[in-house]
């Protein structure tokens, strides 16, 4: 099992220059290799097998940065091509832009070239960087790779990937089940009748964000004031992102500890965001990110995340008698059945998802 820990790093001026240089060289290699592959295929109708080493003679400044960062750029390009050939809908690999807000590079542990201490991190071709380690790393975790990134706000982070050989937990029998139904207000509803109560951080910060973006639009592009204001806008977005992640981490941890199996619908969130004109609501919820967090936390505990088919009529079926309605408008917020059952439609759907999840679990057991 692999585990990642993201930490804040505090590079000095010289180290920031080295990080930016490595990011730039990694981007250059990716784009150059992609351009050469396209050009070669157009002429020869074959895939070019090029490597970063073949470019160092023509571009000697590539030797100044970590060679493993360039090798990882090659791996990322090859991965993009494999994904395209496997799923053409993903799109053909695209060039990486220098103006992209978030830039990063990845390097690997090889013969002790990376050292992690309580207050410092040693990276290849760089002096030790001051860090803030917010959690104790278990002694049996083995460091595999480090991804150094710069956020739009100008902050630098390092994502440490560890191999945890002794962390694999056997699946335990499930007794306590929970059903979760997606909801526009509050992110989701539980089969217990409770709501997640997500505070809609983006909606709350929308006025302030609009004000800061309006100020940015009045600045002269690429001026010093423009860069300062751009950073303020980025800090607003970063705060919203951090608030959302903090809420979701705490909620997913609580559910993973309380229940043996959590049942959810396998929704097409991207389609809902665009097709139903629910873009801001779906994206502010971050429901997909929440399910990802919940999934790996349940796996760590040896518990189960059960996905119910998205076409299962969870909203139309009565959770008491099983009667299925032919029509149910999106505006109908209460589920009223002929049997006398009257409850919130989202709670009714969550109960149905839980029962369908139980059925799937018993079939697979």
Residue ranges and their predicted role:
Residues 1-365:
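Nucleic-acid substrate recognition interfaces
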